[in-house]
Amino acid sequence: LEKKITEFLGTEDTILYSSCFDANGGLFETLLSEPDAVISDELNHASIIDGIRLCKAQRFRYKTSDMADLEAKLKEAARARFRMIATDGVFSMDGSIARLGEICELADKYSALVMIDDSHAVGFMGKSGRGTHEHRGVMGRVDVITGTLGKALGGASGGYTSGRKEIIDFLRQRSRPYLFSNTLAPVVAAASLRAIELISSSGELRERLMANTRRFREGMAKLGFQIKPGEHPIVPIMLGDARLAQSMAARMLEKGIYVIGFFYPVVPQGTARIRVQISAAHSEADLDFAMAMFAEAKSELGL
């Protein structure tokens, strides 16, 4: 499975973990120490945030996808031995895609490493489904990619870190979640291998997923919902108020649609939302039913 992921992502080597949370938790502490610096997007996943907390490197945080602020932080960290830029490939609460092309340009300019957590992209983003680095045209320029086997690559559990061979070799020797935890169950590895084979053999599922995403996004906009713009299958329906998000989620469950309301501290105050995740397994009838139920709930809540 490690070899197959390496081939699929176009990297040099891969190491498996029991989860992507463990992959991120075992990365920064292993690679970075006091003389180093990590520059992290402010909307990064909790696992990146917690992983960075475990290391002793200098920490800088830049405004999300703000390249001017990222450059300013790289300059602030000029005296660091090594600098690493850390970002989600796709931000899980927004469905927005990192500006990896510009990030890689800045990394080249300031001799920094680039790390992405691509859990919400590998398997369907990019021409061949390889993820954000393929989607943004920077394959071969990202030093470290972490990801999960719990979404498009099998839907069960497990995670990985993939990238430059010297980095992966070092993780095998020093990364605590790898050394002191269990490996994947064989059935999970087999399912993930099969998932990669399916993704590699045909683009049909990716095309269906993107068609479903367009249908749902366009339909919800016509119904008057405020959704964050984009092309990703994560579709945030912005409601603002935490109680409203909870009420909407409860109404939808009563109508046979399971969605979750997110609010502070998971998202910033005043930006409560329902996060919908579209699948290639959804039929047009499924999507139309979901939109009809959203319209009913919207009317019942007086929106």
What is each model feature region?
Residues 2-26:
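Short loop-beta-helix segment that forms the pyridoxal 5′-phosphate
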Residues 7, 254-257, 266-303:
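PLP-dependent enzyme catalytic core of the Aspartate aminotransferase-like
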Residues 27-46:
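Conserved PLP-anchoring active-site segment centered on the Schiff-base-forming lysine
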Residues 32, 63-67, 79, 83-89, ...:
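Pyridoxal 5′-phosphate
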Residues 60, 64-116:
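Active-site phosphate-binding strand-loop segment of PLP-dependent enzymes
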Residues 110-113, 120, 125-231, 244:
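Active-site C-terminal subdomain of aminotransferase-like
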Residues 207-216, 221-256, 266, 270-271, ...:
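Conserved PLP-binding catalytic core of the aspartate aminotransferase-like
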